[in-house]
Amino acid sequence: ADSLPFKSSKDKHELSHLYETKIKNMGNAGRNGGQYYTPRPLIRAMIDIINPQIGEKVYDGAVGSAGFLCEAYDYMYKRMEKNVDNLKILQENTFFGKEKKNLAYVMGVMNMILHGIEAPNIKHTNTLGEPIRDIQEKDRYHVILANPPFGGKERPEVQQNFDIKTGETAFLFMQHFIKSLKAGGRAAIVIKNTILSNSDNASIALRKHILESCNLHTILDMPAGTFTG
């Protein structure tokens, strides 16, 4: 590893590409990487629609391999005016995230460093362990981009942190993201499509909450096989 080039932005870009290819291949082989990898064309399409701007804070509460934050960095860097102030804002006060799992946390931080984010603002913590009623204005973000885990089953003590109690991990994350979004902010979130059809009380309540609390722009139903792993 000591012999690898790591000086120029081109070197870092090549290394980051190799790193993400390795994560993707892990997912294709059915190993751990598939839990943390969202297809990059999908991420880029979501970011194009959201159009994050310099000065806005971008958040992912289920960071995984940090694909959303890395792609948002690339998007904003290419489009912003290159000056000292903007570069400082982009590096230090733009990208934020949380990740519970040890491997995912390490993978995400490393991916951000390889993309050029020198000191990632990623917390190693359980996002769902934080009561949403404690989220204040200072804790909110202009942009949220995420693909929270599907199919998890959360314990009752975790469910108590949310207004709508459900064991479905992704549905708790959705509540967290809504609460964490600034007024007038934008979010693009990948979530299982059963949120549209489940007839249990929690799913009905969550759909009602989304329609009443958010300005819902688009629902895009992806075909089978979109995700690896």
Map each language-model feature to its residues:
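Alpha-helix boundary recognition
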Residues: 2, 211-212
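Short glycine-dipeptide loop
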Residues: 181-187
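Short, conserved beta-strand edge motifs with alternating hydrophobic and charged residues
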Residues: 145, 188-190, 219-221
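Class I S-adenosyl-L-methionine
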Residues: 215-229
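Acceptor-substrate binding/catalytic loop of class I
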Residues: 195-199, 228
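Conserved S-adenosyl-L-methionine
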Residues: 33-146, 151-153, 158, 165-167, ...
